């Protein structure tokens, strides 16, 4: 670097979810009053980047998302996403040759235990995909499992807010067609997939999975209708147990196995910790289950030794953060709670490593039920400004 060059800090600001479209209709960004943004746009050079489909390692027609965006920006190259990896494995048939899964399923059959499939059930493609559930059910069928239970988490964020009926009807039809499986409970993702340490939400989902919910019905379609009657859209439908033919709840029991079907990790970690970890203390578990096998579609936590990832993590070498560190430069990652994993873990290529010279600051997100109650979140926090200035 020439000695005459000024050494000034550089800011990379990621406006998550911000996009460009010329049409005014239903375009909140274009219709908003943004004098500062518009001033920057009109004064300085700018360009567009594609943030979906094959441009970020996703299948054709698949929208991008926060994790994918941060991963590709941090990598500086196209990174094949887990959705595409899993789809390819199913298409090639390799998915159905997974020895650890097959051996676990054989053990369940020999011991008369049950398989429980958990996860977000939709075709949103951000955290999971319903096609992966169907592939896992096919494998369970091939292994001649008799006791297979599905605990779908309802979407309504990456899909329309009242679209759960079509997905659950489709699931029920598929279960009847293949001749195995029963829906044992449902839960809105607001409860089962919290990532902001709102543990009372996770506790409700945990109790439904392990003991049964005080809210119970005999038909999952009825459970959704009742949720709508309570003015709950899909993501907010309270954990509900679906009774069996003997009017009993179906729960995860000692010796049963679990496969968590989410391939995105951030919203799967908390409920996994509650189900699996011996030293868990975020809330008092009224019932601790000894799960025989706990599979996750991808790795949720590299330090977790009690679960097994079906698809191992792929490494992204020489990411932006790693490169900056190798140059001996300093870097600061700052975000509030909701996006902290994205500017750290995902931006570093799915790597938990904190590089030399890398500082991290987490600004707490506001404690509100939903962020439409405080849409600015913590953007006006003095901590953002003071920490940036101090670095």
Functional labels for PLM-detected ranges:
Residues 2-10, 19-190, 200, 204, ...:
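Active-site nucleophile/metal-coordination loop of metallo-enzymes that catalyze phosphate/sulfate
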Residues 9-15, 258-262:
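Short, hydrophobic/glycine-enriched beta-strand segments
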Residues 16, 77-86, 356-369:
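Short, basic/glycine-rich phosphate-binding loops at helix/coil junctions
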Residues 109, 159-253, 266-288:
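Long, well-ordered, tryptophan-enriched scaffold segments
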Residues 250-270, 276, 287-291, 299-302, ...:
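Active-site pocket-lining segments that scaffold enzyme catalytic pockets across diverse folds
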Residues 330-382:
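Conserved ATP-utilizing enzyme core subdomain
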Residues 22-23, 82-83, 194, 250, ...:
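Short helix/loop capping segments that flank catalytic or ligand/cofactor-binding pockets
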Residues 383-390:
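Conserved small/polar residues in nucleotide/adenosyl-binding loops
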């Amino acid at each position: 670097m020439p000695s005459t060059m000024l050494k000034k800090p550089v800011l990379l600001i990621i406006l998550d979810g911000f996009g460009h479209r010329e049409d005014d209709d239903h375009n909140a960004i274009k219709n908003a009053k943004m004098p500062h943004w518009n001033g920057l746009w009109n004064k300085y050079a700018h360009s567009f980047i594609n943030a979906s489909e094959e441009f970020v390692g996703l299948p054709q027609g698949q929208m991008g998302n926060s994790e994918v965006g941060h991963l590709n920006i941090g990598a500086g190259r196209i990174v094949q996403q887990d959705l595409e990896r899993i789809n390819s494995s199913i298409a090639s048939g390799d998915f159905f040759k997974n020895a650890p899964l097959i051996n676990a399923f054989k053990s369940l059959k020999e011991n008369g235990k049950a398989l429980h499939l958990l996860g977000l059930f939709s075709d949103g493609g951000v955290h999971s995909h319903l096609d992966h559930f169907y592939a896992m059910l096919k494998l369970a069928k091939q292994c001649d499992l008799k006791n297979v239970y599905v605990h779908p988490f309802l979407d309504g964020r990456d899909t329309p807010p009242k679209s759960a009926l079509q997905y659950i009807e489709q699931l029920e039809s598929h279960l009847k067609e293949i001749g195995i499986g029963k829906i044992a409970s449902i839960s809105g993702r607001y409860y089962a997939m919290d990532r902001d340490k709102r543990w009372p939400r996770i506790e409700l989902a945990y109790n439904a999975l392990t003991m049964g919910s005080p809210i119970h019905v005999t038909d999952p379609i009825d459970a959704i209708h009742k949720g709508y009657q309570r003015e709950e859209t899909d993501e907010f439908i309270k954990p509900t147990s679906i009774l069996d033919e003997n009017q009993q709840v179906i729960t995860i029991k000692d010796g049963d196995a679990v496969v968590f079907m989410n391939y995105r990790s951030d919203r799967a970690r908390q409920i996994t910790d509650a189900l699996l970890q011996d030293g868990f203390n975020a809330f008092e578990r009224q019932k601790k289950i000894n799960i025989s096998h706990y599979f996750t579609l991808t790795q949720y936590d590299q330090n977790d030794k009690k679960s097994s990832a079906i698809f191992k993590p792929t490494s992204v070498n020489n990411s932006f953060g790693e490169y900056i560190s190798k140059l001996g430069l300093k870097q600061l990652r700052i975000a509030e709670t909701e996006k902290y994993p994205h500017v750290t873990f995902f931006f570093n290529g799915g790597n938990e490593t904190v590089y030399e010279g890398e500082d991290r600051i987490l600004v707490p997100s506001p404690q509100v039920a939903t962020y439409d109650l405080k849409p600015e979140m913590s953007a006006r926090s003095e901590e953002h400004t003071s920490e940036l200035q101090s670095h």
